Amino acid sequence: MLLPKDPKKSAKKIQEKLKKKLNKDISIIISDSMTRPYRAGVINFALASFNLQSLEDLKGYKDIYGEPLKGTEVAFADELAAAAGLLMGQSNEMKPIVIIKGLNKKRHETNNNAFDLIIDKNEDLYR
């Protein structure tokens, strides 16, 4: 399956059409596989998303010992894409869509795209 030319627009368009057809407030993630520095194998990641808080900033929240977190940001859309990748497969499984139900996370209109996960070149440890 080929990726859309504009994944960001496509995620929004798919979400709007399915929301209208199903009458449900849903989120969309378009994913692809990638390699990672210092790790073997590929993993799914969120190429684009819509109606989903893609990055969850937990700075200031308490950890399991009651200590405040200082720099924890969760790549929430990537975590969902990786989980979906287990079901979609990476070769000839031909399962291009995974539905995740019962996820109790808030929808987010402003921080709603996986492009928000791209970090500045100056903060990137691998460039």
What annotation goes with each model-predicted range?
Residues 1-45:
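Internal active-site segments that recognize and position negatively charged phosphoryl groups
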Residues 26, 30-127:
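A structural signal for small-residue-enriched, beta-sheet-centric alpha/beta enzyme cores
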